[in-house]
Each structure stands twice: as C-alpha cells, then as structure tokens.
Amino acid sequence: MKDYDLIDSGEGRRLERFGEYILDRPDPEVLWQKTLPEADWKIADAIFRDNWVNKNHVPQRWEMQENGIKFWVKLAPFKHTGVFPEQSAQWNYINKQISKSENKQTNILNLFAYTGIASLFASKAGAKVTHLDASRPAITWANENRDLNGMADAPIRWIVDDAVKFTDREAKRGAKYDAIIMDPPVYGHGPKGEIWDFNKDFAKLLKNCSLIISDKPIFVLVNAYAISSSSTTLANTLQGYFGTFGGKIENGELTLKEKSAGRLLSTGIWARWSSGVVK
C-alpha cells in the first residue's frame, strides 16, 4: 500500500505512516523489541495512549488512496484511523473477482462494512453494493469516502442494522447476493442494542448468508480481528456452508511488513470461499 508504511514495531507499539503523518499506536500482539532508536519514534505526529495526543497539529481528517480509491483518515476513538492497511490485498482481490466475473451485474453484500473502502472498490469494479454497519457514525464516514471519490450516484445501498437480523429478513424475502464480504468483530452491539458475540453468532450468520447466496456465487470473504479462533476455523466453517458449490477455500493471516527489520506483524486472520471461475 503506497500511502502506508509500518516503520517499526516493538514493546507493545507500532510506528506507522498514514499518508504524510506518522502515528504511534499500541498493539498488544507486539511482544518483541523495537529495532529503531527511541529518537526515531519521537518523530510521531500523534500518539495514542488512553486517548490521542496530537503533537504536531494533525488535521481532523486527511486523504489517502489505494489503486484509485480515496478515503479519509482520522484520529478516531480506540486508536482507530478508519482504514486497515493490511486489507489492501483483499480490496484488490474484490476488484479482480468482480471485474472479471461473468455475471452481468454482481450484487454484493458487505457486512460490518465500517468506513466503506471495500464497498467502494466493489462499486468501482461494477458491482451493486449493499453496505451494512451497526454504527451510524461509521456509515457517515463511509458516505464521506463515497463523496471524496465522486461516487454519489454509485449503486450503493447504505443500511444501519444488525447483521444477523438483516440477513434473516433477506432470507425470508428471497434476496440473493453473488458475493458477501464481512469483517465481524469479536463483540459488538447492533443499533437497537442487539448483542454480537463472534463465538455464538458467527455460524448463524454464515448459515443466513448461505440462504441468500445466488446460484452463480463468486466469493465469500471473511476478515476477523482479536478472536480466539484460527483462520483454519474460519475456513472449516466456510467449507461447511459453501463447499457444496465446489470452488476452493483459502485462509491465512492479515499481516504488515516492517520497513525497519522486515518482520511480519500479524494483525488478524482471513478466510474466503471462491467459485474458482475467476483465476
């Protein structure tokens, strides 16, 4: 990802470049020592501890882009920035699968869709997108990203809802999607106080998704963070619900590579089923 670098990591911290600004953020997975001297870490424009400490007048938001899609980055609560750079390979996968699909118009469902970067990649590739998140501020941010790209007229449906309830209703309506993307958290709340617990609800959600996948499906992609399961568990669960379509299952870790020492930082896991039609 050209607008991002993992400059260094160590001792529970990450030093990262988001566009023109350097951020120092916590990461409990980083158990090793830093490579760069402390003086290099002091160049950070903002540091997150319990809250963001804005040292060098980082603006309220600033622009980044990847492969023609622009998005706003912000110093958001809980150390977040509105973008997960390790997912850039997934965005390119989404773009390739849709743009090379034989389907006349691909109908995509994006669940736990956050600030909408994957939705914009899907839309730009020619898909009709249903973008769902339980957080209204996240939907607002996604709309800002849409407008930044001049895509106000793109066929994207924006929905604030609980993922399990929505897919329940879609199954009863007979709705069908050619591809499904999801980034389920370990815990979360729906807009009406619904409780999301990955260990209890993930299989139910995948079952719902298996009922609304079309008869010419392209892919189902799951990214997950901070869960106790492995990517193999995700893959096995996908196989159970989508293996009847044939195709193939892939899985692995979401990683970032340091500039300082070349170490790989694992940030999450992923698994995906694909029909295999698009190579």
Descriptions of predicted regions:
Residues 115-127:
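Conserved SAM-binding loop of SAM-dependent methyltransferases across substrates and taxa
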Residues 104-114:
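Conserved class I S-adenosyl-L-methionine
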Residues 135-181:
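S-adenosyl-L-methionine
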Residues 85-103:
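Conserved alpha-helix/loop element of class I SAM-dependent methyltransferases that forms part
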Residues 128-134:
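Conserved SAM-binding motif I beta-strand of class I
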Residues 217-279:
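C-terminal catalytic and target-recognition region of SAM-dependent MTase-like enzymes
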Residues 163-244:
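S-adenosylmethionine
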Residues 2-19, 23-85, 92:
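Non-catalytic substrate-recognition/targeting regions of SAM-dependent transferases
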